[in-house]
Amino acid sequence: MSLIVSDRFRIVVGLGKSGMSLVRFLANRGVSFAVADTRENPPELATLRRDYPQVEVRCGELDVDFLCRADELYVSPGLALATPALQQAHARGVKLSGDIELFARYAKAPVIAITGSNAKSTVTTLVGEMAVAAGKRVAVGGNLGTPALDLLSDDVELYVMELSSFQLETTDQLNAEVATVLNISEDHMDRYSGLPAYHLAKHRIFRGARQVVVNRQDALSRPLIGEGLPCWTFGLNKPDFHGFGLLEENGEKYLAFQFENLMPVRELKVRGAHNQANALAALALGHAVGLPFDAMLASLREFTGLEHRCQWLREHDGVHYYNDSKATNVGAALAAIEGLGSDIDGKLVLIAGGDGKGADFSALRAPVAEHCRAAVLLGRDAELIAQALGDAVTLVRVDTVQAAVEQSARLAQRGDAVLLSPACASLDMFKNYEERGRVFAQAVECLS
């Protein structure tokens, strides 16, 4: 149903970045709506009151009777659908939806939809750069950068969207041209009842998809629906007939499609097996929408990675320092430890800790024992990580990132790498993972 011809009333619940994009979208289409937020002073409140003074806004505890005035609630991803007021409104017949559902209704160009526990932003950025290199008018965003509704334009030829599990919870039918779940590992266990619930939320991305891309080495990435859809695969093993992978020739590894070498792995500017997997996933997604190989490979050769994502900072006294502050869950830390650990001559000194979000850290023990010389732990859940690691490596506990860098520099030997890959969120000590990464980078720069 067109929003313009509908006389139904909506409420935007949550006034952050995506909530404000909903406000702009609805206001520009003449839709009748109001706004609610659980916070007394949400981030975009001043902007709303300045630009849309006529819009009713309620801040503080959600009022169920107020919510039930609406036919539909557009719930921001930061607010759990299990929130009692939302559940009560839903039980009384109010539809729960979100910005991605609206985006899907109005997007006219093909959509590449990307989710996963890790590497979403890197792969999304890579595919966007590949599309630009191929001469496409492309819009990139969603959970990364620009909110989805702000990207809508008749001029766009291709959308490349990073989507979180929270965004997908309120998305019934995305209708992507190609969709992928890059990988699945425990994350946000403070919001989900367990891995199965998180898994189901991620897999909503496949609803209505015309093609899928699957990680051959992660069974949880395979669609629960859509048997018979065109399927492309990627993995760090030999490619299958519909897949991208690694081949070896004369002792050199190549990114490959089917049985054809595409480019030597050594030509990638980003290091580690996890970055090879990211490159292969991006190739599969680009190929699914017809991007030419020459443009995609040129983009791969120039890609230097994203800030706070296994980002090389400097070399000091024969030790390399990497900022992987974006590793806010165990799966992301595992990818960095295994990917970088297998790519250097020495050992890693790992810096980890923060808000674990209810995660199980036991999966860290084996790769840390294999690839790390020591682990320097800090933050709220440092002791939980220490218990999981046991006697696998030398453990050092500190109170600040600066102290962690100083201790790591003492522990590391020439040929080693110091890796900040926390396996935790940052909110116990920092505003966000970006601030944590900047503090780490500053501490590394101060080493002398």
UniProtKB/Swiss-Prot annotation:
This enzyme catalyses: UDP-N-acetyl-alpha-D-muramoyl-L-alanine + D-glutamate + ATP = UDP-N-acetyl-alpha-D-muramoyl-L-alanyl-D-glutamate + ADP + phosphate + H(+)
The molecular function terms of the Gene Ontology recorded here are: ATP binding; UDP-N-acetylmuramoylalanine-D-glutamate ligase activity
Q: In which pathway does it act?
A: Cell wall biogenesis; peptidoglycan biosynthesis
Xref: Pfam families: Mur_ligase_C, Mur_ligase_M, MurD-like_N
**Sequence positions that bind ATP:** 116-122
- All disulfide bonds of the chain are none
Q: What is its EC number?
A: 6.3.2.9
Its domain of life reads Bacteria
BP GO annotations: cell division; cell wall organization; peptidoglycan biosynthetic process; regulation of cell shape
The cellular location(s) given in this protein's UniProt record come to: Cytoplasm
Free-text function comment from the UniProt entry: Cell wall formation. Catalyzes the addition of glutamate to the nucleotide precursor UDP-N-acetylmuramoyl-L-alanine (UMA).
Family statement drawn from the similarity comment of this UniProt entry: Belongs to the MurCDEF family.
Provide the protein name: UDP-N-acetylmuramoylalanine--D-glutamate ligase
Native source organism of the sequence: Pseudomonas savastanoi pv. phaseolicola (strain 1448A / Race 6) (Pseudomonas syringae pv. phaseolicola (strain 1448A / Race 6))
Q: What is the lineage of its organism?
A: Bacteria, Pseudomonadati, Pseudomonadota, Gammaproteobacteria, Pseudomonadales
